[in-house]
Structures are given as C-alpha cells and as structure tokens.
C-alpha cells in the first residue's frame, strides 16, 4: 500500500475531498495511484512515501525520493534495526560498443584519488571508519549500462565517539568519484593497465563458466540488432585496446551525460540531509547535459533462430529465449511475472516438476523473466543427446499453461514464492540499495510490497492470457564434447 505524507498546502489543489485521506499517528496520509504519484513527484510536492505492512499500523521502513539535480535522484531508505549502512552512487548510460571502456571506470576510480593517492592510503582511511568497505558493480538494465560504486559501514549509533560514520564514508566515496588522481590530466597508465588485466580476468571467468557463457550468448544472438545484445563488460579485445587517455575522456563523459542515483540505506537515526549537501558540494563544478535512452521492446518473434556450439564439457547447456509481447516494462507485468514463475520459477513450477523431476531430462531447468527488456529465458543443463526431447518438453509445458492446464494451487505457490522473495529485500541495507538501483531507468521507485500487492490480484485467466503472448525467438545449444568430470560448468 502506497501512503504518501504530503504538504498540507497541496491537499485541496491536488487531492481534493478524497476518501482515501486519513490520519495515522498524527500524520495526514492519502492513498494515491501511480499516475498521481508521478505528477506529485515531478512537482516536488511529496515529502515522504511510507510503507505500512498490510494489516499493521507499525512502520517497517521509510523511503524518501528527491530530484536534486538534472537527472540526479537522491533516495534514502531508513529502517529501525539496521546495524549497518550502505550508500552508493550509480551512473546509467546507454549501452554501446564502448561498454568495455565504461565498465573499467568504477575499478580505476576506487583505486586512488587526489586525497588517497594509493590503495594503502585508502585502506588506512577505511580502517579508521571501523572497517568500511568500498565495492563496485557493472550491470545491464534494459539497454543501459549501470556503473555502481558503493560503501558499506557500521551504523552511526555504534561509533565509539558519536562520529557520523555514514556521512564520512560518503565523503570518501565522493572523493574517489569526483577527485580522481590524474597525472598530466589523465589517469595513470600503470594503474589503467593493472585494472584492465583484472577486468579481462573477470570477463574471462564468465566465459569459462559455461552456464553464464550460454546465457550471454543467447542474449547476444537473440538481440544481435539491439543494444541489449552487448555484454555489460564489453569484450576482451575492447578491454585490451583501452588507453588511459580514452578512459579519461570516457570518465568526463560519464559525469556529464549519465543519469545519477545517490542512494543511502541506513538506520532511521542517520542524518541524510548532510549527505545530500556534501554530494552537491563535490558535484558543484560538474557540467551536466544528461543523455536519455529508451529501451527497445520487440513484442514477438516471427522466426526462430537456432545456433549450436561445442565446448569441452560434459553437460550440455540449452538456453531458449522468448519474447513476452510487452510494449514497455509495465505492460501486463504482474501477469507475465506470475506466468514465468508458474512456468519455471520455483520448485513447484512446470519445468521443475515435469521436465526435471518426472521426465529426468535436465540437471536443472528454470525460467527467468527479464522485465527491463520484455523477454524470458529458459536455462537448462542436459545430456547433449537429450536436446530435442528437452526442447519439446519445455515447449509442451508452456503450451499447457496457454491451455490453462494448471491449478489454483500452482498459482498460489508462485504468488507465495514471489512474496517471500520480495519481502526478503528489506532484510539488509545492501539488498534495499540494490532494489532501488534496479529502478533507476525510469525513476519509478516502488516498494517490494507494491509488487506483492500487484501479484495478489493476478488470476488464472490473467496467466493464460500472458502465456498466449509468448513466442519463441532463439534457441542456443552448447553441446558438450567431454566425458570427464571436473570442467567449469
């Protein structure tokens, strides 16, 4: 349930005599729909959005959202009981053939800065902050590349001398991002070469992991004419070709053109206003001309593409890519998510119970909906000689759902599995930080509870309709050529 704490001055002009207006613990609140919420956010009228668990008056956690600059969002999540805090800066840019170049930026930034010229200096500073840790992540959200730098620490109330640990950790993070160590105006060549090797090793490890490799190859083939087909880390050749001059140019482009999300997840006692002011001070001289990018959704497949490769592994990898009939990320989302889960998202699903358990055709077999692109993947590990049987069985189970051959118990099991998964998001600051980061593309920052309520309203007829929108696009088979155990599968 979305409940917005609003400025009283806008009640009459924006809400009127809405029956949804009520008072809770001295706070005037109103239940609103998503369209009105988005309009109020744009007007800067919403102070806070609170989530109250269904049937309970106790506040679980609060979420504040503000736009503090051009395409710069500031999100704070506060919950009583957190013993640690997590703050992050995420930069979203269009996914292009320069993915390798941008993927290297978080690594080089967290290596040194003007104030902390070596890793040793940085580690000493983090040690004074009770062992705070810096982390980086590169992900793909739709046809966008998201570069994330984060810092995790103990909560302020555990500091021995009442220090503002979270704010000081954010200061270190901003120092790394906005004041990197340059020599003659560029990143140090030795440091760039070192980080290139590490990034190439990371990508190489993904190639060696055949389950990950097969999934990435499916996306590359299925979306060959779409930006989504590009690996979030780029290519080995792309990494090796990077120069320190090119990396410096890309870094400046990132600060200028990326959409930015500053997120802080902590105990309710942490003062986040000071963190916002600190960020604005560091970013004050940064020129901003943000570049917008919309993900292309392909609703259906006209033909099926089939590609087979071989590898020296025992277990074959069969990956099937489906188009979900979505025009955008919100197009019948709840029904399609439940459909994907009934199909292969949990131990009670069709793929698990029938294809894996009853027919014994797969070592593993599951489906996964990729909402940000409107596609669904089925990944399975099989004996290569069972390829045709496995493909047929997987498609047969999808047909069963299209015909409505599943029970209300199957539907309820999927809803319960998704509810449990979404509720676990609020278990830690890190999980909440990741949750809101995934929503950076459209600035539609909704709670896990919002989606749980969406799922509760999905009917069997909704799932049947969603299944009938699904079309098979691409099949990728990685055939094993080895009999021995022990390969990286």
Describe these PLM feature segments.
Residues 75, 83-100, 120-175, 211-234, ...:
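M16 family metallopeptidases and their MPP-like homologs
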Residues 241-248:
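Active-site glycine-rich loop that binds ribose-phosphate moieties when present
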Residues 2-5, 10, 14-17, 27-31, ...:
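Short, positively charged and aromatic/hydrophobic N-terminal segments
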Residues 112-115, 157-160, 179-188:
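Short, polar/flexible loop-turn hinges at active-site or ligand-entry regions and domain interfaces
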Residues 201-205, 303-315, 420-429:
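Short, low-order "capping/linker" segments at domain edges
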Residues 458-465:
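A short, acidic, amphipathic alpha-helical segment used as a generic capping/interface helix at domain edges
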Residues 123, 179-203, 290-299, 396, ...:
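Acidic/histidine-enriched alpha-helical segments
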Residues 46-130, 235, 248-354, 395, ...:
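His/Glu-rich zincin catalytic helix
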């Amino acid at each position: 349930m979305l409940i917005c704490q609003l400025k009283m001055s806008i009640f009459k002009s924006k809400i009127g005599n809405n029956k949804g207006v009520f008072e809770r613990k001295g706070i005037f609140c109103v239940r609103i729909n998503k369209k009105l919420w988005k309009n109020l956010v744009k007007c800067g009228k919403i102070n806070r959005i609170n989530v109250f668990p269904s049937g309970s008056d106790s506040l679980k956690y609060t979420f504040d959202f503000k736009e503090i600059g051009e395409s710069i969002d500031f999100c704070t999540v506060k919950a009583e009981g957190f013993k640690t805090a997590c703050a992050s800066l995420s930069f979203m840019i269009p996914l292009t053939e320069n993915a390798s170049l941008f993927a290297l930026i978080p690594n080089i930034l967290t290596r040194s800065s003007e104030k902390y010229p070596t890793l040793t200096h940085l580690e000493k500073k983090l040690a004074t902050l009770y062992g705070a840790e810096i982390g980086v992540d590169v992900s793909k959200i739709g046809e966008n590349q998201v570069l994330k730098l984060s810092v995790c620490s103990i909560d302020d109330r555990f500091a021995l001398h009442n220090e503002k640990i979270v704010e000081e950790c954010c200061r270190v993070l901003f120092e790394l991002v906005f004041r990197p160590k340059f020599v003659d105006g560029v990143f140090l060549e030795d440091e760039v070469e070192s980080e290139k090797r590490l990034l190439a090793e990371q990508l190489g490890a993904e190639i060696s992991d055949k389950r990950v490799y097969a999934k990435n190859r499916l996306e590359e083939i299925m979306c060959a004419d779409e930006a989504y087909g590009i690996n979030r880390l780029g290519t080995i050749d792309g990494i090796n070709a990077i120069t320190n001059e090119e990396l410096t140019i890309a870094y400046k482009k990132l600060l200028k053109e990326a959409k930015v999300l500053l997120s802080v997840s902590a105990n309710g006692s942490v003062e986040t206003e000071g963190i916002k002011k600190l960020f604005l001070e560091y970013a004050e001289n940064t020129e901003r001309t943000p570049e917008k990018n919309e993900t292309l959704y392909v609703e259906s497949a006209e033909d099926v593409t089939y590609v087979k490769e071989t590898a020296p592994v025992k277990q074959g990898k069969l990956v099937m890519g489906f188009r979900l009939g979505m025009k955008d990320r919100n197009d019948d989302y709840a029904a399609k998510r439940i459909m994907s889960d009934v199909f292969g998202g949990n131990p009670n699903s069709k793929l698990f119970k029938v294809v894996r358990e009853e027919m014994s055709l797969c070592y593993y077999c599951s489906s996964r909906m990729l909402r940000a692109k409107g596609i669904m993947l089925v990944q399975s590990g099989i004996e290569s000689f069972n390829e045709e049987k496995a493909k047929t069985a997987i498609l047969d189970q999808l047909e069963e759902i299209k015909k409505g051959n599943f029970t209300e118990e199957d539907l309820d099991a999927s809803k319960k599995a998704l509810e449990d998964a979404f509720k676990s998001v609020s278990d830690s600051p890190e999980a909440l930080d990741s949750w809101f980061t995934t929503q950076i593309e459209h600035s539609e920052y909704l709670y896990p509870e919002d989606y749980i309520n969406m799922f509760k309203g999905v009917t069997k007829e909704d799932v049947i309709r969603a299944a009938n929108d699904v079309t098979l696009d691409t099949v990728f088979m990685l055939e094993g050529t080895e009999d021995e155990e022990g390969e990286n599968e």
